[in-house]
From Swiss-Prot:
Pathway: Sulfur metabolism; hydrogen sulfide biosynthesis; sulfite from sulfate: step 1/3. This is Sulfate adenylyltransferase subunit 2. Gene3D superfamilies: HUPs. Keywords: ATP-binding, Nucleotide-binding, Nucleotidyltransferase, Transferase. It comes from Hyphomonas neptunium (strain ATCC 15444). It catalyses: sulfate + ATP + H(+) = adenosine 5'-phosphosulfate + diphosphate. NCBIfam families: CysD (TIGR02039), PRK05253.1 (NF003587), PRK12563.1 (NF009214).
Length: 328
């Protein structure tokens, strides 16, 4: 067909009439599953931050989200190792199984692990039983994290937080900026359009990056099953000594539990949906001993996975206040 200017216009035939050859099948893009898309997004975030920032680090809390994030980091930079170390802020009150798992896993992968503890808090004898969850978290987690970031000069820290976990995390950006004092101002967050991330910082600022922002608890568990990711055994049900303390079912993990509390302990079949300091992490009664059992439980549950975390109950909007002060 010729236009009035003399040029030829080729008219495309309707899709139903277009010729198709078997050779074209090899160029057809594969259909990505829901988990494939989440994985691709996370890999992009990891590579983007690693490329744009001078000295990134990955926060490693030893939990299921950290396990998934570490697995993604190993994929993102394969066959090389991740171009950043792992940082574990040790409060001194983690489950013994967590610490043993951490040391073994890091050794197996051949990664650099930095462990930091707030020595001022240790000298003061700060602990959840003696000082309460709010003060313990502020000194042994928040202050310790800021100390470590300043000590090593990191300008970016990867974290495993997800938006479905808690209200303040739901409104935080994938790339979350911190002031020179590591404070977060939710009113000054930058817009994030599609998958375009602005990592530019003013002098003294730093950022936190959350590759798992758009994942849900169910996504995490389905990905763990698909990828065969190893976890701390505490996530699966087993007979464990537990006692109710401050309306939370906690595990008696060592002899630092006050005698009057430990004396009331009973052995029950329990597991943990989230892990932290053992006196501040509630267990749930469960018979889920396999990944399939856990996934089935999650499909039927009507409560948040963080319902057993004492630090989320300190006061109204406690998590947002902690994040503004520099918490993970």
């Amino acid at each position: 067909m010729r236009t009035r200017h003399g040029a030829f216009l080729l008219l495309a035939r309707p899709a139903t009439e277009r010729a198709h050859t078997p050779e074209q099948d090899q160029y057809t893009l594969p259909t990505l599953t829901h988990l494939d898309r989440l994985e691709a997004e996370s890999l992009h975030i990891l590579r983007e931050v690693a490329a744009e920032c001078e000295k990134p680090v990955m926060l490693y809390s030893i939990g299921k989200d950290s396990a998934v994030m570490l697995h993604l980091a190993m994929k993102a930079f394969y066959p090389a190792r991740p171009p950043f170390p792992l940082l574990h802020v040790d409060t001194g009150w983690k489950f013994r199984e967590m610490i043993a798992f951490r040391d073994r896993k890091v050794k197996e992968l051949g990664l650099e692990l930095l462990v930091h503890m707030n020595e001022d808090g240790v000298r003061e004898g700060v602990g959840p039983f003696t000082h309460g969850s709010a003060y313990h978290t502020d000194v042994m987690k928040t202050a310790a994290l800021k100390q470590a970031l300043d000590k090593y000069g990191f300008d970016a820290a990867f974290g495993g937080a997800r938006r479905d976990e808690e209200k303040s995390r739901a409104k935080e950006r994938v790339i979350s900026f911190r002031s020179a004092g590591h404070r977060w101002d939710p009113k000054r967050q930058r817009p994030e359009i599609w998958n375009l991330y602005n990592t530019r910082m003013h002098k003294g600022e730093s950022l936190r990056a959350f590759p798992l922002s758009n994942w849900t608890e169910l996504d995490i568990w389905q990905y763990i099953r698909r990828e065969g990711i190893e976890l701390v055994p505490l996530y699966l049900a087993a007979p464990r000594p537990v006692v109710t303390w401050n309306d939370t079912l906690i595990m008696v993990d060592d002899d630092r539990v006050p005698a009057e509390i430990a004396a009331k302990a009973e052995v029950k079949s329990v597991r943990f949906r989230t892990l932290g300091c053992y006196p501040l992490t509630g267990a749930v009664e469960s018979t889920a001993t396999t990944l399939d059992d856990v996934i089935q439980e999650i499909l039927l549950t009507t409560t948040s996975e963080r319902q057993g975390r004492a630090i989320d109950k300190d006061q109204t909007a406690s998590m947002e206040k902690k994040k503004q002060e520099g918490y993970f």
